[in-house]
């Protein structure tokens, strides 16, 4: 008899209901409720408790594992944006160290920029833009970084991870590296392609890394390549022609090219100085209405034009004799390139190369609207770049923004890689005094030296 009772009890504890609890646990909970309430109609209350299940039991919460360790780390990093940073502990006493006072900085309305882009159906979405706003706040308040201004540049997609890019200026001028002798000097900090310092992170809220300065050679080499980013800054750039640097340098060159071509402002919002080309806000600027801002003629390039030399201001070689005028063809076409004037309108941009069968080449910019109805008032309008897919400029009233979200690949015609260099001749010139024009083999110095034979061991 005792064995039968034990088997029955084990059966009740083993059988699970659809909610995950056993029959034994359900009966025990029902009896406990009857004994606790002690109702007059105990039998009916017991039947009701057994047949009905609590609302919480109907909600099964399965444990959903993270897709990968990187996804879990990204979720933790993004969650850290919504709370106070963890205090730094003193290694000797173990007590928290008083944090530094927040750094004072200026930034654009990142959340408002997200609303403008949402109106056009582009961008990252409100949830991700809100996290980008918190990341901008954290970067700007970091006293160790010492930034003066912060702007959210956009997002680059990668095969293994993505890049979130932040454009900043520093409160103090950093030390600039010197260009190697015989190369085109890079532009100093605060000017041209090195006017801003860029920080990137793979996740919003994750660790930030400062990108290096860009050189003219890196910009010129990046124009010959078309490749995807991996998401690892230390990854090598395996391509031909060889790129002088790793993926961090390649990403920085892409940012320089994209910012010079797609960061725009409404026409007339800034005025340029005739001598220094420095921009200043125009207090008399009157914003245009809705759909008028979808015309490229009403937008201007905000950053300086990037010339073929890889600089915004061309660098000319010094003539051999400074007292005499150089020859007519002493300077190359790159050194003589003038470029468009500051704040050139977008309608002056060259169209894209026409594809096979196209009678008219596609324009460099296309209009985008928040509504297909012309009568919609106060709607957001802007332009979208066809040369750099993913670059969008939006405007509503006095609020405008420019952002890039893409793969970092330039459009425009069919692309073919550069042909390999001509093969190196295996035979040298005929040596003097050799009869019959016999050619001698050239000694190759690239091979490692021949190893010495091993020493014989004494038996």
Swiss-Prot record:
Asymmetrically dimethylated at Arg-267 and Arg-398 during flagellum resorption. Probably methylated by PRMT1. InterPro entries: Radial_spoke. Keywords: Cell projection, Cilium, Cytoplasm, Cytoskeleton, Flagellum, Methylation. Residues 309-330, 418-459 are annotated as: Disordered. Its main location: cytoplasm. It holds the Pfam family Radial_spoke. One of its GO terms (cellular component) is motile cilium. It is found in: Cytoplasm, Cytoskeleton, Flagellum axoneme. Flagellar radial spokes contribute to the regulation of dynein arm activity and thus the pattern of flagellar bending. They consist of a thin stalk, which is attached to the a subfiber of the outer doublet microtubule, and a bulbous head, which is attached to the stalk and appears to interact with the projections from the central pair of microtubules. Belongs to the flagellar radial spoke RSP4/6 family. This is Flagellar radial spoke protein 6. It comes from Chlamydomonas reinhardtii.
């Amino acid at each position: 008899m005792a064995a039968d009772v034990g088997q029955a009890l084990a059966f009740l504890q083993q059988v699970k209901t659809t909610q995950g609890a056993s029959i034994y646990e359900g009966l025990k909970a029902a009896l406990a409720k009857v004994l606790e309430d002690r109702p007059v109609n105990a039998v009916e209350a017991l039947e009701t408790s057994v047949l009905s299940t609590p609302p919480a039991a109907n909600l099964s919460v399965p444990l959903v594992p993270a897709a990968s360790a990187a996804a879990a780390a990204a979720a933790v990093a993004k969650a850290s944006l919504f709370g106070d940073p963890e205090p730094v502990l003193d290694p000797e006493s173990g007590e928290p160290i008083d944090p530094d006072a927040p750094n004072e900085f200026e930034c654009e309305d990142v959340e408002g920029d997200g609303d403008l882009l949402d109106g056009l159906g582009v961008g990252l979405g409100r949830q991700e833009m809100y996290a980008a706003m918190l990341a901008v706040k954290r970067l700007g308040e970091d006293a160790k970084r010492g930034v003066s201004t912060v702007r959210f540049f956009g997002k680059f997609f990668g095969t293994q991870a993505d890049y979130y890019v932040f454009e900043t200026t520093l409160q103090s001028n950093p030390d600039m590296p010197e260009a190697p002798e015989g190369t085109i000097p890079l532009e100093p900090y605060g000017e041209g392609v090195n006017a801003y310092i860029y920080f990137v992170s793979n996740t919003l809220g994750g660790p930030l890394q400062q990108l290096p300065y860009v050189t003219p050679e890196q910009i010129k080499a990046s124009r010959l390549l078309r490749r995807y980013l991996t998401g690892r800054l230390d990854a090598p750039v395996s391509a031909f022609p060889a790129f002088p640097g790793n993926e961090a340098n390649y990403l920085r060159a892409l940012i320089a090219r994209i910012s010079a071509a797609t960061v725009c402002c409404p026409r007339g919002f800034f005025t340029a100085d005739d001598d220094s080309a420095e921009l200043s806000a125009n207090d008399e600027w009157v914003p245009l209405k809705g759909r008028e801002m979808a015309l490229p003629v009403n937008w201007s390039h905000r950053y300086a034009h990037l010339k073929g030399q890889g600089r915004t201001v061309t660098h000319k070689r010094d003539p051999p004799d400074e007292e005499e005028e150089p020859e007519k063809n002493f300077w190359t076409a790159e050194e003589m390139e003038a470029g468009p004037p500051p704040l050139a309108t977008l309608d002056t941009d060259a169209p894209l190369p026409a594809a096979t069968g196209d009678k008219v080449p596609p324009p460099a910019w296309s209009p985008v609207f928040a509504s297909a109805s012309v009568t919609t008032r106060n709607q957001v309008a802007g332009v979208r770049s066809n040369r750099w897919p993913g670059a969008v400029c939006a405007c509503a009233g006095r609020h405008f923004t420019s952002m890039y979200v893409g793969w970092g690949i330039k459009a425009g015609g069919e692309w073919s890689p550069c042909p390999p260099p001509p093969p190196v001749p295996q035979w040298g010139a005929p040596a003097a005094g050799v009869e019959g024009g016999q050619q001698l083999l050239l000694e190759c110095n690239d091979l490692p030296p021949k190893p010495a034979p091993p020493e014989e061991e004494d038996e």
